[in-house]
Amino acid sequence: MTSNEKEMGKSELLVVTGMSGAGKSLVIQSLEDMGFFCVDNLPPVLLPKFVELMAQGNPSLQKVAIAIDLRGKELFKSLVKEIDIIKSRNDVILDVMFLEAKTEKIISRYKESRRAHPLNEQGQRSLIDAINEEREHLSEIRSIANYVIDTTKLKPKELKQRISKFYLDENFETFTINVTSFGFKHGIQMDADLVFDVRFLPNPYYVEELRPFIGLDEPVYNYVMKWKETQIFFDKLTDLLKFMIPGYKKEGKSQLVIAIGCTGGQHRSVALAKRLAEYLNEIFEYNVYVHHRDAHIESGER
């Protein structure tokens, strides 16, 4: 929500949805701690009625978060339509947060919790089939989400910190750029809008004295950045982003995730993500955050 919208008294509604086992309950708990009025598992058909309550000006409903999942499959089909209708109103600002995780991670979480998947409560099918069906059903709502968060590699504390960063930052209403480094060997960054592969650059892994360090350490950072190939790539990348980013903002996107990947996610991608975040902070007035997903995984880059 922008400052102008707050001044005009518009209410804020956040719909939290996504894969079962991806962390919706934890997000709702975090939002409740931050002062949101939270509702868990509201049927989508009741969403317009709840918005009408918000529009009546009740102070306790100024900031609302509603978790909606796929338990009622038939009811869920109307969610995108209901969201479109609410977005056309001028008294409520609606955002959608979509949580997801890799299938193997969701399976692991369900085994730990010993709970049944909502699409497999009778145990009549395999868990992986239920997860795949859910992912297919959720593809449409994912496509309209303002925020897509992959929780595969996030610990509960890290997920809470990310939610806090979104909603406790006084500049939250501005366009946000998240720059992330990752290692392809650990899987691509699932929530990325733009992915850049820097595995063509000289690799510090093969310099024995640099191998134990990461791209945030000065010797590795300087090694990665000193090459002509790196400078040419960085110049071309920033030229492209200077052209693209304002366009994303103009089209109404509130968050852009830029992922930079190398083999292990410890050296080249970390150095480039660090430099890119610094550069974007210098030339734009947007919120720019940087995260190094795999930087502290035991070194094994090739």
From Swiss-Prot:
Superkingdom assignment: Bacteria
Entry coiled-coil feature ranges: none
Keywords: ATP-binding, GTP-binding, Nucleotide-binding
Binding site for GTP: D69, L70, R71, G72
Binding positions (ATP): G18, M19, S20, G21, A22, G23, K24, S25
Database matches in Pfam families: PapZ_C (PF22740), RapZ-like_N (PF03668)
Single GO term (MF): GTP binding
Function in brief: Displays ATPase and GTPase activities.
Family, per entry: Belongs to the RapZ-like family.
PANTHER family, per database record: RNASE ADAPTER PROTEIN RAPZ
NCBIfam families reported for this sequence: PRK05416.1 (NF003828)
Protein name, UniProt field: Nucleotide-binding protein SERP0433
Originating species: Staphylococcus epidermidis (strain ATCC 35984 / DSM 28319 / BCRC 17069 / CCUG 31568 / BM 3577 / RP62A)
